[in-house]
Each structure stands twice: as C-alpha cells, then as structure tokens.
Amino acid sequence: MSIEQLAETAQAMVAPGKGIIAIDESTSTIAKRFASVGIENIEENRRAYRELLLTTPKLSDYISGAILFDETIRQKTKDGVPFAEYMTAHGIIPGIKVDKGAQPLAGMPGELVTEGLDGLRARLEEYYTLGARFAKWRAVINIGEDIPSGTCIEANSHALARYAALCQEQGLVPMVEPEVIMDGSHDIETCYEVTEATLRSLFGALYEQNVVLEGTILKASMVISGKSCEEQASIEEVAESTVMCLKSTVPAILPGIVFLSGGQTDEQSTAHLNEMHQLGNLPWPLSFSYGRAMQQAALKLWAKDMTGNFAKAQQVIYERAKENGLAALGKWKG
C-alpha cells in the first residue's frame, strides 16, 4: 500500500465527528466483563455480543472504525458474513489488536514492556488479507515511586516504533497507544511529566524507524489525576493540560489523535473530550477510541435479556457513539 493510501485511511479514521470503538478485549478480559453481568463466557456469546456492537444500525454516523481481537476478525454474523466484510460494506474500517500483552520488564520492578514482535510480519500479512486496514499496539506506563524509568519508556517506545514500521510495510495504518495508567495517588502534574516524556520518546523512536507519520494515528491517554489522588483535577484542567502536553510533543503532521477512556466514567470521558474542543487552535483532529466507556451500559442491558434487549442495547450503543461524536466536534451539551 502506498503512503497516499495509508494517509487516506488514517484521515478517514479521524473524520470530523467520528471516532473508533475498541472491542479488542482478550478472551480473559471479556470473561471478567461478562462475569460482572452474569453472562457465560463461551464463544457464541462473545460472537453474539460483537455482532450486537458491529451491526448497530447507522453506527457509521459516528464511528469510523473498530478495533477487533484475533477471534473476532475470524468470526461471522449470524447470516454468515465475516465481520470485517460486514464492517467494510457499512462504512466502518476494520482494525486489529496485534500486541501480545504487557509483561514484567526484567530488572525493573513494577514496570512492564509489551510483547508480540516475534512473527508479527506474517500476522500482519494475514490480517490484511482478512480485511484489516489498521492495527493497534498498547504499551503500559505505570506511575509509582521512582517509576517509570527512562529504560521502561525507551523499551516500549522502541517496540511501538518497530511495530509501526512493520504495519506500514504490510499496508496497515499503525495506531500507537502508550497508555499512562490512571491507577495511583499521583497528581495531574506528575501525569503531565510522565506523559510528556513518554510521547517525546515515542516520536523520537518513530522517526528513527522511518515510520511515516502521515499514515499513523496516536491513541493517547489524557493528562489526568491518579484515581486515588485526593485532589482530582477539574474537567477544564484535564482538557488544558492534555492539549498543552500534546502540543509540546506531537508533530502537527500527524493525521489525528484518539483518546482512550482508561477507566474514566462514561460521562467524564465525553466531557473531557468536549472541553478540549472549546480551547480551539488544535493542530490535529482530536477524537475518541473508547472501549468500556462505549459499551458498559449496553452490556448491562443486553445481559438482562440477550434476545429481547438486543435492539435496545444497540440503541444505547448508538446514543453513546452520538454523544462522543458530538464531543469530538465540541458540540456535546451533557
């Protein structure tokens, strides 16, 4: 795929008023979500749930793409249409999570590095033939006493850059996700410092690996107070700090930035995104790539009656997509 085609896909992913739904939970993660609402974690239930999400009527009004898990990209609708094929036909770009998860970084207590580079070229080639046009790799950066270390940040940046270069070689837009974790008692200033250092390292590594930024999307965490911090930053403070941090680290040539919800409530994640757009003068589109913050209310409703509430749960998904789509334009009213 040419640079022009990668850039075209990346731009479509951050089209005005549209975002990306993350439904790439691993089998173990979806097991926890299902258990919390009393759904049995079997393949057919996982398939049916993904069908509920992906076949929501008019979803493409506010959703440009969806990040899938390996199992999901191989599954079909109840009518026998592969999910990726269904999505493409309905204006939603198929994406695929390709990392193998974060593992302890040897010699660095409390720190993690994401694995999955071995054999990645062949996996990306297969995912492209299955219909994927973008991929996602998540790095995990914890904040704690004397962490993160520069070593941890550099190791994750290097892996993200190698992944991104392989994606572009195989015709997929790389979504790079260096998540600074919300857990902890740190204040918003500490989160800013860590996020800034992480993003500076990441874009340096992308440059060194000859990754074309015009065909790359950043999935960023917001600059926010730690969950157990006594003083929680306001919506305005989160928006201002996040935009300031991004402006100081992210090249303007990047097609766009989407945010992860990272454990924020549904309303917080929408309100923060909306507030960023009130600041104006943004060098790139800012949108969303939410998982739990898009799905949780619909999952609870569906669990009560998996047949009878199917359409009602889809309506909830559509409404959440609409709220976030409006927030991505700065037009959400709360």
Curated annotation (Swiss-Prot):
One Pfam family cited in the UniProt record for this chain: Glycolytic
Q: What SUPFAM superfamilies does the record point to?
A: Aldolase (SSF51569)
Q: What class does this enzyme belong to in the EC scheme?
A: lyase
Q: Which domain of life is it from?
A: Bacteria
| Keywords attached to this entry | Glycolysis, Lyase
Pathway(s): Carbohydrate degradation; glycolysis; D-glyceraldehyde 3-phosphate and glycerone phosphate from D-glucose: step 4/4
Family membership: Belongs to the class I fructose-bisphosphate aldolase family.
What name does the UniProt record give this protein? Probable fructose-bisphosphate aldolase class 1
